[in-house]
């Protein structure tokens, strides 16, 4: 899907392309990609690089065309292997042509358009737009981190009631998401530091870059804090599970030993050995009483040693 935006004096939608407008491309089909490449002579590998979900944040310049790939947050289904992940957003520019391409429909881009329309100022140039996209991505990383924090708290409350596999698997998935966030944010920070020297920056852009740096730093540090907390939480519950397992094994071993004593004593009386009670009518009662006494002593000993 292609949308044309007039970026001068506010963000308003156009019916067709005009010089210096912004072309927003979301979930492009093969026909959309082919049309853009043929109409604007975009290098053919630009689209394939942007479509690669594992493509790192980077800057590239080819025959007058500039390609910037930014990693932005994206939410899958909550029960998926990684509910929160990141996807590439491509920014393509040459002279009066500015195109953004994302192969996923993200809340960040929807919010970006809505926010710029509320501002009613548009963009001063393509550099201003690029850094505002950086700022929006940092803000949305923080939003998604708050959601992850809420899911972690919910899982911890469930685990406090009962240690179950579903909650532990959920925490593990969120840990994977934080790893993706941390890697992508660092890549965006590295890209931002390079763009400071690649693009022509005026005083307004410098102020905007400072805001982006602040938000990026906060997002990175927040991700690191949540990751450390989640890792510590996982280690704690792993220790609890191991401790519970050890307790169960000690109890089973102790009960097995206690249950083995009557069998051992009655087996001794059942052997063809002379013990002086073969002809006594109360021999069986003595064997039972002896088994109970020895088992009781073993039970008391294990309880005293906190083995059961």
Describe the predicted segments one by one.
Residues 1-197, 201-203, 211, 215-218, ...:
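Peripheral, non-transmembrane regulatory/ligand-interaction domains of membrane transport proteins
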């Amino acid at each position: 899907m292609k949308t044309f935006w007039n970026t001068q004096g506010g963000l308003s939608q156009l019916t067709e392309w005009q010089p210096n407008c912004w072309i927003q491309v979301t979930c492009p089909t093969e026909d959309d990609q082919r049309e853009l490449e043929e109409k604007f002579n975009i290098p053919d590998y630009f689209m394939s690089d942007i479509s690669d979900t594992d493509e790192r944040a980077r800057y590239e310049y080819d025959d007058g065309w500039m390609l910037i790939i930014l990693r932005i947050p994206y939410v899958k289904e909550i029960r998926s292997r990684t509910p929160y992940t990141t996807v590439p957003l491509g920014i393509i520019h040459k002279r009066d042509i500015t195109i953004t391409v994302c192969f996923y429909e993200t809340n960040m881009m929807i919010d970006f358009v809505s926010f710029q329309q509320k501002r009613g100022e548009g963009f001063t140039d393509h550099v201003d737009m690029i850094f505002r996209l950086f700022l929006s991505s940092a803000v949305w990383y923080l939003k998604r981190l708050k959601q992850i924090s809420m899911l972690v708290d919910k899982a911890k409350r469930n685990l406090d009631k009962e240690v179950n596999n579903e909650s532990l698997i959920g925490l593990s998935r969120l840990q994977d998401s934080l790893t993706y966030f941390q890697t992508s944010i660092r890549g965006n920070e590295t890209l931002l530091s390079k763009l400071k020297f690649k693009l022509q920056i005026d005083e307004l852009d410098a102020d905007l870059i400072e805001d982006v740096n602040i938000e990026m730093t906060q997002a990175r540090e927040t991700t690191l804090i949540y990751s450390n907390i989640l890792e510590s939480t996982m280690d704690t519950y792993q220790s609890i599970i191991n401790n519970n397992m050890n307790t169960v094994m000690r109890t089973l071993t102790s009960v097995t030993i206690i249950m083995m004593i009557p069998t051992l004593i009655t087996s001794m009386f059942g052997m063809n050995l002379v013990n002086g009670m073969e002809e006594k009518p109360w021999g069986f009662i003595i064997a039972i009483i002896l088994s109970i006494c020895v088992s009781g002593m073993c039970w008391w000993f294990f309880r005293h040693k906190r083995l059961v």
